[in-house]
């Protein structure tokens, strides 16, 4: 992104706040990407329709919370940065949030500290691909049928074992187990990041004026918080 365009975007982002058009577009693109990856996995087609919907709702924002900091680390940035140069943390440089220590702290945890964990881990491409597969087979969605949970659990266990064997071959038996633990902690960190992002949305809707938010955006926020989209 050219510097002058980046400055215009930064100014627009700070004026429009947390739920800006670029943010909403990014969420929609993320959902499409998430659906495409899920469809490419054989286990997804084995799930009944209601399980597919519940599963996608469960993993879509965890997927964003995992890939956001990974992409920033891959691009060499210290905070969430997409390939178009967009940085969500810039929102909180706005005077609107200047004295809101809670939002600033949450922003640091979600958008900056999460990247530091990926920088420390320095995942290989194989590890990243297998962790994505583990996220897409995580059987924790509310409303999943027992059969759906079993299918996803078996698939998740398969990818976990592949990741373990991969690291044991290249690092050693004990070191491979330790590396697996570090990798799984990145998924747990993504779950924490997703939780923080939802806290930020709930807090924002409660304590900040929504007068400039249209009905479509209001519904978008509610769907994000409740996972009903």
Functional labels for PLM-detected ranges:
Residues 1-229:
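Nuclear receptor C-terminal ligand-binding domain
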């Amino acid at each position: 992104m050219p510097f002058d365009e980046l400055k215009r975007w930064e100014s627009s982002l700070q004026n429009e706040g947390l739920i800006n058009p670029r943010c909403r577009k990014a969420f929609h693109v993320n959902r499409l990407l998430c659906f495409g990856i899920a469809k490419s996995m054989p286990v997804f087609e084995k799930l009944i329709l209601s399980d597919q919907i519940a599963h996608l709702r469960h993993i879509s924002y965890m997927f964003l919370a995992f890939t956001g900091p990974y992409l920033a680390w891959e691009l060499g940035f210290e905070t969430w940065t997409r390939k178009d140069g967009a940085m969500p943390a810039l929102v909180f440089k706005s005077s609107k949030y200047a004295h809101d220590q809670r939002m600033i702290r949450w922003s640091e945890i979600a958008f900056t500290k999460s990247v530091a964990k990926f920088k420390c881990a320095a995942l290989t491409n194989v590890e990243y691909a297998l962790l994505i597969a583990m996220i897409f087979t995580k059987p924790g969605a509310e409303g999943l049928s027992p059969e759906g949970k079993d299918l996803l659990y078996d698939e998740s266990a398969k990818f976990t074992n592949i990741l373990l064997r991969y690291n044991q071959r290249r690092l050693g038996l004990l070191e491979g187990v330790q590396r697996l633990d570090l990798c799984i902690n990145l998924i747990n960190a993504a779950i924490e990041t997703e939780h923080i992002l939802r806290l930020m949305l709930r807090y924002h809707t409660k304590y900040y004026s929504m007068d400039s938010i249209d009905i479509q955006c209001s519904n978008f926020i509610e769907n994000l918080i409740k996972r009903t989209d």
